[in-house]
């Protein structure tokens, strides 16, 4: 039967999700229970989660909604048969058709997941973009030395929310797929993230003027790893090495917390030089997430 999942299903959902991913890629970094709970609760808005239960959960679709972006993101995992997978996949999109008409849909899966990729294409979804998950391990302690005219300062997210919001929106304005939120929605979304690193927000300044930001997450804490949530530099300050300094600052911050590694996500089509920067600092791709889209 198809039913709505609850928090009571969290452990079984974790087993199903990791079973799906490890079947596709035996080297996949297993998801922690905290991530499943986050999926179930939703981010700024409540999630809707459907499962196919046939003597146990065989497939799940977590549906996240961002009304300000007019976007929904369904995440699909299955350890069932092809018929069971298709049944829940179709039920999930039927729910979207009924409840999220007019919304843009973004969904992702491992590039190695040929079965799910085929289901995406058979359902009329269009290829969008590939994204790397990259990890650096081990990581080193020690914050980088800064030029005399550059500073990197810790910033409380609430107190400095107006500035951090502006720095993110302006530095990511030209990035593919980025959709800026207004300040209040942006702050609410950040504060709703249970894995937000409340000591991991930093602002880079050049001659005292705000020039870039770094936001950190504890989303990999279960595997003793940190995560770079956002790293951006305003266009007028690019070419000064701020991105490298901020990245090294984030690495040192993660090491100070006792983490052994740090990860981040990057658009493989990013033309800003970010991918080369990450590779030069020792990050290596661990997963290629393939993105698909459609409009309901």
Please give the residue ranges for each predicted region.
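Conserved acetyl-CoA-binding loop-helix of GNAT-fold acetyltransferases
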Residues: 82-96, 233, 239-252, 256, ...
């Amino acid at each position: 039967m198809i039913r709505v999942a609850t928090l009571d299903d969290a452990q079984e959902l974790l087993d199903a999700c990791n079973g799906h991913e490890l079947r596709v890629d035996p080297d996949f970094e297993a998801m922690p229970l905290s991530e499943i709970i986050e999926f179930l609760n939703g981010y700024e808005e409540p999630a809707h989660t459907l499962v196919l239960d046939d003597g146990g959960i065989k497939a799940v679709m977590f549906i996240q909604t961002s009304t300000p972006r007019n976007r929904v993101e369904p995440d699909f995992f299955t350890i069932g048969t092809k018929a069971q997978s298709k049944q829940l996949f179709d039920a999930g999109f039927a729910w979207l058709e009924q409840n999220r008409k007019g919304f843009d849909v973004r969904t992702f899966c491992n590039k190695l997941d040929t079965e799910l990729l085929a289901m995406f294409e058979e359902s009329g979804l269009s290829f969008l973009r590939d994204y790397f998950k990259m990890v650096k391990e081990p990581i080193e302690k020690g914050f980088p030395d800064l030029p005399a005219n550059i500073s990197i300062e810790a910033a409380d997210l609430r107190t400095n929310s107006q500035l951090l919001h502006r720095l993110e929106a302006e530095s990511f304005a030209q990035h593919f797929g980025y959709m800026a939120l207004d300040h209040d929605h942006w702050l609410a979304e950040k504060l709703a993230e249970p894995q937000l690193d409340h000591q991991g927000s930093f602002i880079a300044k050049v001659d005292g003027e705000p020039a870039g930001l770094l936001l950190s997450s504890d989303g990999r804490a279960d595997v003793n790893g940190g995560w770079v949530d956002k790293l951006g530099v305003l266009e007028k300050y690019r070419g000064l090495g701020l991105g490298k300094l901020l990245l090294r600052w984030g690495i040192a911050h993660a090491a100070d917390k006792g983490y052994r590694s740090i990860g981040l996500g990057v658009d493989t089509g990013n033309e800003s030089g970010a991918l080369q920067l990450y590779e030069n600092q020792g990050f290596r791709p661990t997963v290629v997430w393939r993105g698909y889209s459609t409009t309901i």
